[in-house]
Each structure stands twice: as structure tokens, then as C-alpha cells.
């Protein structure tokens, strides 16, 4: 399975990159951070994205991933009820895409 990490230079992102690299059944498709293009998720064939970015950027990242059929795992803190409702709305338009919100993975 091809997995990408957003926020790859942060503490949790770096741990996720290391774990993916150590797993025999996962392939790191992209390790992106501030300033990197999300288009790399599509060009690398990413199937799942793990987001350890910031509350300010997570929704844009989720929208991009979901619109491109990429499943998401969110480890970003600050995911409130309004963001959850927006995520549900995005997912309702893309029923084959899944999302897991786990904001305290540290």
C-alpha cells in the first residue's frame, strides 16, 4: 500500500515516515512538508495520506486528498465539530474514500 505523510519534517511526521519505511507491506509514496505540492500525492499513486500538519492547513489537505480518491488519517490536533461536519460533507460526495480522525497520536 502506498502511503504519504504530510508534515513529514515534524516530530510525529518523521516518526510516521520511519514506521512506513520499516513496514514490509507499506511503501512511502511521498513525504511532504510546508511548500511542497500536493500534486505529488496523485503523481506518486498515493492510496492513503497521513496528515500531521496544522489545524490551519488540514482541511485544504483533506479536500485535495478526498477529491483525488485518497483515504486519509488525520493526526492533527484542533479538529473541532465544524471541521468534522465539513469532512462528513466532503466524504458524502466521495463514498469510496475513508477517513480516520485521531488527533492525539503522540
Predicted segments with their positions:
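Rossmann-fold NAD(P) dinucleotide-binding segment
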Residues: 42, 48, 52, 56-75
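Extreme N-terminal starter segment of soluble prokaryotic enzymes
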Residues: 1-4
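NAD(P)-binding Rossmann-fold cofactor-contacting core
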Residues: 19-40
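Short, acidic/turn-prone active-site loops that include or flank metal/cofactor-
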Residues: 36, 77-80, 105
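Hydrophobic beta-strand scaffold residues
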Residues: 28, 72-73, 98-99
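N-terminal Rossmann NAD(P)H-binding glycine-rich loop of SDR-like oxidoreductase domains
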Residues: 6-17
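Rossmann-fold NAD(P)-binding glycine/threonine-rich loop
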Residues: 63, 76-100
Amino acid at each position: 500500500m502506498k502511503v504519504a505523510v504530510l508534515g513529514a519534517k515534524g516530530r510525529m511526521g518523521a516518526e510516521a515516515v520511519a514506521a512506513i519505511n520499516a513496514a514490509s507491506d507499506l511503501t512511502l509514496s511521498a513525504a511532504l512538508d510546508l511548500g511542497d505540492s500536493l500534486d505529488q500525492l496523485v503523481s506518486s499513486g498515493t492510496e492513503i495520506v497521513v496528515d500531521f500538519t496544522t489545524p490551519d492547513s488540514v482541511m485544504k489537505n483533506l479536500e485535495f486528498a478526498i477529491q483525488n480518491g485518497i483515504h486519509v488519517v488525520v493526526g492533527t490536533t484542533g479538529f473541532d465539530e465544524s471541521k468534522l461536519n465539513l469532512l462528513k460533507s466532503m466524504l458524502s460526495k466521495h463514498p469510496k474514500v475513508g477517513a480516520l480522525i485521531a488527533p492525539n497520536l503522540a
